[in-house]
Regions:
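Acidic, low-complexity intrinsically disordered segments
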Residues: 47-93
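Acidic, aromatic-enriched beta-alpha/helix-loop junctions
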Residues: 21-58
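N-terminal, helix-rich and Lys/Arg-enriched segments in bacterial and organellar proteins
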Residues: 9-11, 30, 38, 62-65, ...
């Protein structure tokens, strides 16, 4: 059993960290997520502002069974699929 947190900018996932004990392992989401964060920040006029920084939020720690590396890999896949579904719905696809 391990704990994990997800870092979001607004509703866009950016990074995941999984804790085994106190030591975390972490992974950034694929580059396309940072590209989307940057694009959205520019479009909304938040780039380079304190409001941009205020959009970064870690979730509360959640518990999940499994090996930390396996949890990390599974979460990346799940978040990619969830985000892709959200984008398709927004575009009416």
């Amino acid at each position: 059993m391990a704990n994990y947190q997800i870092l979001y900018w607004k509703d866009i996932p950016a990074q995941i960290r999984v804790f085994e004990g106190r030591k975390p392992i972490s992974r950034q989401m694929p580059k396309r997520f940072q590209v989307e964060i940057d694009r959205t920040a520019m479009e909304t006029g938040l780039a380079g502002t304190d409001d941009y920084l205020d959009q970064w939020q870690w979730t509360e720690k959640r518990e999940r069974p499994g090996d930390p590396e396996d949890i990390l890999n599974a979460l990346v896949q799940e978040l990619e699929a969830e985000y892709d579904d959200k984008v398709r719905k927004e575009k009416g696809l």
